[in-house]
């Protein structure tokens, strides 16, 4: 009763059914808030001013628009606050968008590696289909590991044991 899920596609999101399935499984109140108007409006205004957005702008803008949306919704809810979903593995390598997905009043998963987050979800009874989906920013069409150029397993080995994968070290 104290949790509100906010699904924020930027136009059409191919895996929105996954997100819908998760909020339905959790039984939480939720909104589907399409941020395309916000991101499109900013890009249109940049074009009007003769500005060409960089690749980083187009990749990070939806994440920042999502955070603006979350804060607008939270401030419109009774005692609403925004939590971020960053985890230790992402934080360790800086895999986030500043003032985007890394923003929130606190980070309940911030002390856990990706593997520990999956184990926590399993312990809490989440179905396997919600645990095995390859992490993706949902923006570039690539997995997190494709974007990073190394695996979360390699990050986690370093974070928890100080062991560096020789392939990553090169």
Over which residues does each language-model region extend?
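Alpha-helix initiation and N-capping motif
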Residues: 35-39, 114, 152-155, 169
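Short alpha-helical "packing" element that flanks the helix-turn-helix/winged-helix DNA-binding module
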Residues: 154-162
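ATP-dependent adenylation/nucleotidyltransferase module used to activate substrates
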Residues: 1-93, 121
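Intrinsic disorder and flexible/low-complexity segments
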Residues: 164-170
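Catalytic subdomain that performs nucleotidyl-dependent activation
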Residues: 58, 62, 80, 84-154
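Residue-level marker of positions within ordered structural domains that often coincide
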Residues: 75, 126, 163
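Short, flexible coil/linker elements and helix-boundary hinge sites characteristic
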Residues: 50, 121, 131, 161-162
């Amino acid at each position: 009763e104290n949790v509100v899920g906010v699904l924020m596609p930027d136009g059409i999101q191919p895996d929105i059914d996954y997100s819908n399935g998760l909020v339905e499984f959790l039984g939480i109140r939720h909104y589907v808030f399409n941020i395309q108007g916000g991101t499109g409006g900013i890009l249109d205004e940049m074009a009007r001013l003769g500005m060409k957005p960089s690749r980083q702008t187009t990749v990070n803008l939806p994440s920042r628009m999502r955070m603006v949306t979350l804060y607008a919704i939270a401030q419109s809810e009774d005692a609403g606050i925004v939590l971020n979903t960053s985890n230790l593995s992402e934080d360790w390598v800086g895999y986030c968008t500043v003032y985007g997905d890394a923003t929130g009043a606190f980070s309940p998963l911030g002390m856990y590696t990706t593997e520990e987050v999956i184990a926590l979800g399993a312990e809490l009874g989440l179905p396997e289909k919600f645990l095995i989906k390859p992490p993706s920013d949902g923006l570039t069409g690539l997995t997190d590991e494709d974007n990073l150029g190394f695996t979360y397993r390699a990050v986690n080995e370093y974070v928890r044991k100080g062991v560096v994968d020789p392939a990553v070290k090169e």
